[in-house]
């Protein structure tokens, strides 16, 4: 029994980054709770501690007007417990998953709070990071030999990528607490869904229909980025609560959380190839800024600006098949009239010119392979996973001045990822190396890591996050230098850190 469920295509899916790294932990030996002789509940879960230490000083200014001196300080001391309950009532399977997290306010986090509060931008990071969440609560039942229903709060996964998403569009992600983790199911935001799947045996496939009725809270919609000045805020915004100036509006006429999302997916096989065709109407994952000077639909409620999640249509397809000694994967997701901010590039108000809609195609090609053994002490062959992502603005014009952070966005934004992992001592020691490089703008990330699995219950993992800049990417200083060339990995400048995680799973 796993701690998170997902809908996957029929046939070979490839090794993938999640399979190569540690999956959501469980022992397979659930604790059984007998409520009555006819009602037995299986309990699984974990208790986990996270710790992160800054490896560089940040240039942002503290409340005292001097740069925050935070090298060597803890940026995270987080403690989480996840519980999954599962039981069978007649022909219906019930699952409930809850997660409870608390953070110790380190000196570094206190400095970030003081810096934001001194600017008149109130910030309480403890409230931001602590959580008591019903992650999932759903029932599964078979209505007929062909028809299956899953009803409730759940995760549905379309697509086969990690770190960056192409066709995985049903849910948003919370990227404000930690980033670049392998277990997407931990950071994906589950939704209340009606999920129906009908098997078409004659065509070796199935049809899935989804409806999100619109009863989720606004914070469950779209991706959550650190826009409040915490540890994952992009440079130079640590210690600056941007949301105090530009709050979220989840009830905008261009995108309202109460409006339903809906779509469908065909999953099938043709020979050794697994494929899907997908359509989904929803709120887009990335927020955009709606400025009062040139509003996109309704003017901001605060008379200045606000973050909104406009409604979009996404049409896509995925495929995977064995090739040579491994598995190739591909995804394509087309979004007509996708909204972007534009104008005033190279200034603190980049994107304040308003919103332009551009047809956008997201593409991914990946390849996974088991390599030859690297030595007699390796207990299994090394696994290599490669991915190439491209965000293509199909009707791109340079004069549109589409904003990528504070700089100009290109027609093609291409990122490559590579993961190498292997196992020693009967799979109890698992070193790994992740490389992420921004081919279009420069910069990237190197993550060397190692995981120790001494038995069924304990998992110890350590990683280093080493960001770098190159090519066209620079970073913005607190005094505004570098605004014209700051792209994705420029915002991660000076964010190198060591991360340790200890988990007891049951």
For the regions a language model picked out, list residue spans one by one.
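Extracellular loop and loop/strand-boundary signature of outer-membrane beta-barrel proteins
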Residues: 64-71, 121-125, 178-182, 248-252, ...
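Detector for outer-membrane/organellar transmembrane beta-barrel domains
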Residues: 76, 88-91, 280-282, 329-339, ...
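Transmembrane beta-strands of outer-membrane beta-barrel pores
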Residues: 49-55, 89-91, 100-104, 155-157, ...
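Residues on the lipid-exposed face of transmembrane beta-strands in outer-membrane beta-barrel proteins
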Residues: 45, 81-87, 136-141, 194-198, ...
């Amino acid at each position: 029994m796993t701690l998170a469920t997902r809908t996957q295509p029929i046939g070979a899916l490839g090794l993938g980054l999640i399979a190569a790294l540690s999956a959501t932990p469980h022992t397979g030996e659930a604790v059984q709770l007998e409520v009555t002789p006819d009602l037995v509940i299986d309990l699984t879960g974990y208790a986990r501690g996270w710790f992160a230490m800054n490896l560089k000083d940040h240039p942002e200014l503290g409340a005292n007007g001097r740069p925050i001196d935070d090298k060597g300080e803890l940026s995270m001391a987080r403690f989480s417990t996840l519980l999954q309950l599962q039981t069978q009532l007649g022909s219906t399977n019930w699952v409930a998953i809850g997660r409870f997290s608390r953070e110790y306010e380190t000196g570094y986090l206190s400095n970030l709070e003081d810096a934001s509060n001194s600017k008149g931008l109130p910030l309480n990071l403890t409230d931001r990071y602590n959580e008591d969440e019903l992650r999932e609560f759903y029932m599964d039942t078979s209505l007929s030999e062909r028809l299956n229903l899953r009803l409730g709060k759940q995760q549905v996964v379309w697509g086969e990528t990690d770190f960056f998403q192409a066709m995985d569009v049903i849910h948003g992600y919370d990227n404000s607490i930690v980033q670049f983790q392998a277990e997407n199911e931990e950071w994906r935001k589950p939704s209340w869904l009606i999920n129906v799947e009908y098997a078409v045996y004659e065509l070796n496939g199935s049809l899935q229909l989804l409806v999100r009725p619109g009863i989720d809270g606004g914070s469950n919609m779209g991706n959550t980025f650190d826009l409040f000045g915490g540890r994952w805020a992009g440079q130079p915004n640590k210690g600056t609560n941007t949301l105090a100036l530009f709050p979220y509006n989840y009830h905008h006429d261009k995108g309202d959380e109460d409006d339903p999302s809906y779509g469908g997916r065909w999953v099938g096989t043709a020979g050794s190839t697994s494929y899907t065709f997908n359509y989904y109407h929803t709120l887009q994952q990335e927020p955009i800024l709606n400025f009062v000077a040139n509003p996109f639909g309704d003017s901001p409620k605060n008379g200045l600006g606000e973050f909104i999640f406009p409604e979009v249509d996404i049409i896509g397809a995925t495929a995977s098949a064995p090739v040579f000694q491994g598995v190739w994967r591909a995804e394509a997701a087309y979004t007509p009239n996708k909204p972007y901010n534009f104008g005033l590039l190279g200034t603190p108000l980049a994107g304040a010119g308003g919103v332009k809609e551009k047809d956008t195609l997201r593409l991914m090609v990946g390849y996974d392979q088991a390599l030859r053994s690297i030595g007699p002490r390796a207990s299994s062959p090394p696994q290599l996973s490669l991915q190439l992502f491209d965000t293509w603005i199909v009707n791109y014009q340079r004069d549109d001045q589409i904003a990528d952070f504070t700089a100009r966005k290109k027609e093609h934004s291409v990122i490559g990822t590579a993961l190498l992992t292997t196992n020693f001592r009967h799979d109890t020691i698992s070193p790994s190396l992740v490389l992420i490089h921004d081919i279009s703008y420069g910069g990237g990330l190197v993550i060397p890591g190692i995981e120790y699995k001494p038995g069924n219950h304990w998992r110890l993992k350590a990683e280093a996050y080493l960001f770098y800049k190159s090519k066209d990417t620079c970073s913005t200083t607190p005094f505004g230098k570098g605004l014209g060339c700051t792209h994705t990995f420029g915002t991660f400048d000076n964010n190198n850190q060591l991360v340790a995680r200890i988990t007891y799973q049951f």
